[in-house]
């Protein structure tokens, strides 16, 4: 139904020299075709239709769609090109009048009246006497009841010996009118488990409880980390710190000496000597508060560890405490490692070089620009470039479908 604010109903006249002439008013000033819907409260009065006048000339003025205008004026053709001079056309039909009129256009199908004393039984599609007794049905044997869902009868105590109420079926819906004519079936219908309520006759399904939340699976974790980290789906921007609750710190680790194997790190305050089975992850977990990304910053390549921590060797020293800002190096997103990004809850994909301490991301969509993304998150374009160096100095490499860091 067309909804619009009706223009002030004063006569609106549009006259062109030697062209069509029409005006808009509350009354029909000319002849009205019998096919026009009754109840119109606004009219287009065409004085002169010369020059191939169509309804497109005044539809914008009355704010009505062409198909709606033709519906109100059925004498018009599909392209509304047969407008006549000295004729009035309906320009507005109130909603209640339109509904009544459409109802008159499509009358309900005529049905043959039933003889007196009969009524129509819609369920069986035939007429019955109103005072007829219900059809006789064969009584059920003792211990059986009618199962609407399976359209048959079964034993009342036909429960699974191990499933409790697993085989109990309540009614799925109200019994059909001819349920009494269905056959009687005795026996078990199978071991299908059912959670439907055992209360008979309610016809209401039992409310299903939501399954318990299962944390997402983190593939290819290093040894000793299976099923120990919990990543919640709603905390993608939260960085999780290793707690060290299930890994004991090596209190007897030998202090570094000038003769130890490894390269000294400027500003390092504490070292860890790598053992045969150590990994970068379990080393970081032995020191509460030490993030994996900070561990990589404290041991920058090429002197100690590479960007994915694949060259960790036994009997070498790695730094586990120091000023991460002093040893901050440009670290690509791969430096955080696939496992670290999964544990931190980073979305995917991200560009190489994304700030490893990022806490919030924005998915780049079609039409986005660095200025628009920065303005949306109340940061400067310079900060956006600093946290996402892969976008380039002029943001020419801001690619659709990648996540950009917008908060650290």
Curated annotation (Swiss-Prot):
Cited PANTHER family: AM15 (PTHR34997), PEPTIDOGLYCAN-BINDING LYSIN DOMAIN (PTHR34997:SF1)
A single GO molecular function term of this UniProt record: chitin binding
Name of the protein this chain belongs to: LysM domain-containing protein ARB_01488
Signal peptide boundaries: 1-17
Chain intervals for the UniProt region annotation (Disordered): 98-178
Notes on the domains: The LysM domains bind chitin and potentially related carbohydrates, and might be involved in damping host defense.
Record domain LysM: where: 42-91, 270-320, 360-406
SUPFAM superfamilies hit by this protein: LysM domain
Biological role: Might have a role in sequestration of chitin oligosaccharides (breakdown products of fungal cell walls that are released during invasion and act as triggers of host immunity) to dampen host defense.
Keyword hit for Transport: no
Comp. bias intervals (Pro residues): 106-116
Family annotation (InterPro entries): LysM1-like, LysM_dom, LysM_dom_sf
GO cellular component terms listed in the entry, alphabetical order: extracellular region
Subcellular location(s) per record: Secreted
